[in-house]
Structure formats: structure tokens, C-alpha cells
Amino acid sequence: MVRPQNVHWFIATIVFFIGFVHANTESILYKVPHNFPLKKPRDSSTYARDVNLISSISLSGEAMSQITIEANTTDLELHNTTYIELADLQRDETYQIKVCWSAIHPISINNLQTITIPRFTEFQGTKSDYARILVTFQVLSDSYPSEHAMVPIQVSLITTRLGIPVDIYPTLIVMVLLVAGLVVTRAPHVLNDLLLKF
């Protein structure tokens, strides 16, 4: 038989390690201003040197989109900032920007934020005739020497509804169904116990 004290230690250990599991995900919420000049479908970007200088995530008709980039974590590339353009956003909407990486890669994500690039402004070798929203972050290696030079990082752009990111909805639905199932299956027993007390 398991002793209650052992169960308490087991639960305490799990709660302690949850902080480490959460360490490989960083996220922020961003609300597009109501007067932000959105790109029209006929608008196009003009690039000074290379089309692929800035990666982008597009939400055209989707509630969630993601891309995988590879970040260089060698000592020459430390403190190098990654830029990703957020495309096809809607005014006055809130989005969650989530950066995830595998826990086997000892890295940290710092300075996760959004920036706005005004129209006709050259930025990282690109220029556009519309204002752009970019997410930026720095990848830092937590081990020396770096065990993996190129680390895959997944960046997700998720629409929020009622203040909740839509990727969490399936989990919430399952939890509500489980609780409802427990209530339905336990209700006759609880009602019977209450009637027996009277």
C-alpha cells in the first residue's frame, strides 16, 4: 500500500518540474490597433537584396499558423535577433505569438516582442509600401560549447476568441465533457446520500 507521505512527495516533485517543462515555450499577446493601416491584397513588398531575408507567418483565412525556423546558436551568432513578419492580421484583434523549442536543446529565448515598421522604411534589406508588424526575439545558448549549431524553433501565430487562444479550445472542451460526465455519473449517488440523511 502506498503511504500518503510518498504520494505527497510525488505530487510535490511533479509540481516542481512543471516549471522546467514550461521553460521551452515563450508567448506574448499582441492586439492590432484599430487604426493600423492593413496591407491590401494588391500591395506588394519590394526587396532591396534578398526575398528571404525576413520570414513571415500568414493568417489568410486561418485561425492559427506556424512556421519552423532554424536558429544558429554558435558563439559567433549569440545575441543575433530573429525577425518574423506577421501577415494578414485584422484590426482590433488580439493574437498570441508562441515560440516553442524542444527541451533537448539548451537555449533561451530573450526579448520576445513585436515591432512596427513604418511604410517605405528599409528594414533588414527589405522595403515595403505598407506598414509591417514583426515579432522579434533573441536565441541564446545555455550550454558551452553549443551542443547543436542549428536549433529548430517553432513560431506560432494564434487568433484569440473571448481572450482565449483558439488552440486551447479542444482541451477546454475535453475538460468540460469530463467534468460533465463526472457530475452525471455521481449525481445519483450524491442525491441518494442526501435523501438518506433526511
UniProtKB/Swiss-Prot annotation:
Keyword Zinc included in the entry's annotation: no
Pfam families, sorted: Pga1
Stretches of the chain found on the membrane's Lumenal side: 24-163
A GO molecular function held by the record: mannosyltransferase activity
Keywords annotated in UniProt: Endoplasmic reticulum, Glycoprotein, Glycosyltransferase, GPI-anchor biosynthesis, Membrane, Signal, Transferase, Transmembrane, Transmembrane helix
Signal peptide: 1-23
Record-level GO cellular component terms: endoplasmic reticulum membrane; glycosylphosphatidylinositol-mannosyltransferase II complex; mannosyltransferase complex; nuclear envelope
Predominant location: endoplasmic reticulum
Membrane topology per record: Single-pass membrane protein
GO annotation terms (biological process): fungal-type cell wall organization; GPI anchor biosynthetic process; protein mannosylation
Further information: Present with 6940 molecules/cell in log phase SD medium.
Function: Essential component of the GPI mannosyltransferase 2 complex. Responsible for the transfer of the second mannose to the glycosylphosphatidylinositol during GPI precursor assembly.
Name this protein carries in UniProt: GPI mannosyltransferase 2 subunit PGA1
Organism: Saccharomyces cerevisiae (strain ATCC 204508 / S288c) (Baker's yeast)
